[in-house]
A protein has these predicted regions:
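Conserved class I S-adenosyl-L-methionine
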Residues: 1-39
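Class I SAM-dependent methyltransferase "Motif I" SAM/SAH-binding loop
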Residues: 45-49
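Class I SAM-dependent methyltransferase SAM/SAH-binding core
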Residues: 52-94
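A short acidic, Gly/Pro-enriched loop at the edge of an enzyme's catalytic core
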Residues: 96-104
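A short glycine-rich, Lys/Arg-flanked "PGG" loop and its adjoining helix->strand segment in the class I
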Residues: 122-134
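Conserved beta-strand signature within the Rossmann-like core of class I S-adenosyl-L-methionine
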Residues: 135-142
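SAM-dependent methyltransferase
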Residues: 142-216
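C-terminal lobe and adjacent flexible extensions of AdoMet/dcAdoMet transferase-like proteins
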Residues: 208-253
Length: 253
């Protein structure tokens, strides 16, 4: 995964109701993280660090790794709490970025969609497995592209943000391609109800992604040595279904 700052002009901390999301996800994560071989957690693609901070509050020692220096700057700008470390580095060779072994790892928020081919995904999983203790879980969450392609869905739900200049709209458009790649277009729009035009583009970029399917994900995990897996359709622990689930959530060991 190469460094990218496609999201440099979008503050994701304002786009997500983080306290509610973290509490909801912890209900799911508390089960696999309840009996880890070590309290050290690895946060792959940590972004602005919300998960890392939350896990540290729960008593874990967390190392967050990301390839975006902009995201890491934002993660550090309010100070780094005890028990948290943020590192810049390539997830494909995370064993060269972090020191020691970990009792568990997470890769959440559709981070793996930035990995563009099967061999590279397998390499990433091998690298992660090399820094995990025996029996340590790797928890993965990506969008369920099987459902998105099957349904023809092109847009994720809109997010409306109030800021000092009024109201903004976060628009995320997807174009699915036959080779499994996705052109993702995150855009931030300024809305002025009395304006002409009423909508103005603040920032908009095309980001190349890969829409990983369940079988592809499992094949890469198998090749990397993760032989035991649990699959869910959301972090509400509902069973995974190819054409119905919003997410693909995997607990791999």
């Amino acid at each position: 995964m190469s460094p990218t700052n496609h999201y440099a002009h979008i503050d994701y901390r304002k786009m997500i109701a983080w306290p509610k999301r973290l509490e909801r996800e912890w209900t799911f994560l508390s089960a696999p993280f309840g009996s880890l071989p070590s309290k050290r957690l690895l946060d792959l693609g940590c972004g602005t660090g919300e998960h890392a901070r939350y896990f540290a509050d729960k008593g874990f020692e967390v190392v967050g790794v990301d390839v975006s220096d902009t995201m890491l700057e934002r993660a550090r700008e309010d100070g780094v709490p005890a028990g948290v470390q943020f590192l810049y580095g390539d997830l494909l060779h995370v064993e060269n970025v972090v020191a020691g072994k970990f009792g568990g790892a997470v890769c959440l928020g559709n981070t793996l969609a930035h990995v563009m081919d099967q061999d590279t995904l397998t390499q990433l999983f091998r690298s992660v497995r090399a820094v995990l203790l025996p029996g340590a879980p790797l928890v993965i969450q990506v969008l369920n592209y099987e459902r998105l392609v099957h349904s023809g869905q092109r847009c994720l739900p809109l997010t409306f943000i109030q800021d000092e200049e009024g109201e903004a709209i976060f628009l995320r458009v997807m174009t699915h391609h036959d080779d499994g790649s996705v052109t993702f277009t995150p855009s931030l729009l300024r809305y002025r109800k009395d304006g002409d035009p009423a909508l103005e583009v603040i920032t908009s970029h095309n980001v190349p992604l890969r829409g990983w399917k369940r079988a592809e994900m499992e094949a890469a995990l198998d090749a990397a040595g993760f032989k035991t897996r649990e699959l869910y359709g959301t972090m509400a622990r509902v069973p995974y279904a190819d054409h119905d689930s919003t997410d693909l959530v995997v607990i791999a060991r």
